[in-house]
């Protein structure tokens, strides 16, 4: 009788709880939203740069027109139309960035909801579950809060810049605005570390 080799069964990973699945989805959503934000930030910086360059050109033309007996009104009208178009485009991009920030806020609220649920299910000093490796659920919430607060301050700064960029005649201030827009002073360099730590903890990145 032919002997059979013993079969080896690869143990299955335990199924994630509903809370763990939501936390993992939230971490992925954070990653995707941050990528979208960076795309919008680069696009809006290019638009803002065009606005500044157009304003510089228009101001130079205004000075030249003072010496001309018959100014070219067509060029003036064309520049104004283009400036209005760029300003509208910049405002639309900012609105898209605000929508991203709103989604980040909702993710943070979801983390808070999971924390509240676990506090109810495991009251007092009762040990609360660790869904992945080492992070308690509260750490996901705290990390999300840190990140969303950075984006909140950044969107407020951008709103201020948008309100003044096309109107100020101070060239140095324009350059400061553009620099702030590109380098996003309220978003700390360690935000990538925070995100990557979250992705590592939830298994989106190999350890």
Curated annotation (Swiss-Prot):
Location in the cell: Nucleus
Any one of the GO BP annotations: cell division
Superkingdom, taxonomy of origin: Eukaryota
Coiled-coil intervals: 78-99
GO molecular function, one term: preribosome binding
Keywords on record: Cell cycle, Cell division, Coiled coil, DNA damage, DNA repair, DNA replication, Nucleus, Ribosome biogenesis
InterPro entries per UniProt: Cyclin-dep_Kinase_2_interact (IPR023250)
Cellular compartments per GO CC: nucleus
Subunit structure: Homodimer. Part of the 55LCC heterohexameric ATPase complex.
Function: Component of the DNA replication complex, which interacts with two kinases, CDK2 and CDC7, thereby providing a functional and physical link between CDK2 and CDC7 during firing of the origins of replication. Regulates ATR-mediated checkpoint signaling in response to DNA damage. Part of the 55LCC heterohexameric ATPase complex which is chromatin-associated and promotes replisome proteostasis to maintain replication fork progression and genome stability. Required for replication fork progression, sister chromatid cohesion, and chromosome stability.
Family: Belongs to the CINP family.
Annotated protein name in UniProt: Cyclin-dependent kinase 2-interacting protein
Organism: Xenopus laevis
Gene from which the chain derives: cinp
């Amino acid at each position: 009788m032919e002997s059979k080799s013993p079969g080896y069964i690869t143990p299955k990973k335990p199924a994630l709880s509903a809370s763990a699945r939501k936390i993992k989805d939230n971490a992925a959503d954070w990653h995707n939203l941050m990528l979208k934000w960076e795309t919008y930030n680069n696009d809006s910086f290019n638009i803002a740069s065009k606005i500044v360059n157009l304003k510089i050109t228009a101001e130079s033309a205004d000075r030249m027109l003072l010496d001309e007996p018959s100014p070219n009104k067509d060029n003036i009208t064309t520049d104004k139309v283009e400036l209005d178009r760029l300003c509208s485009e910049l405002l639309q991009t900012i609105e898209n960035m605000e929508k991203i920030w709103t989604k980040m806020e909702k993710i943070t609220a979801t983390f808070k909801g999971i924390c509240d649920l676990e506090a109810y299910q495991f009251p007092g000093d009762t040990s609360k579950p660790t869904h992945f490796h080492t992070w308690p659920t509260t750490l996901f919430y705290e990390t999300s809060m840190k990140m969303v607060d950075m984006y909140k301050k950044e969107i407020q700064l951008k709103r201020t810049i948008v309100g003044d960029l096309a109107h100020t005649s101070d060239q140095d201030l324009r350059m400061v605005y553009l620099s702030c827009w590109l380098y996003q002073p309220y978003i700390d360099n360690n935000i990538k570390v925070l995100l990557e730590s979250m992705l590592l903890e939830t298994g989106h990145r190999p350890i």
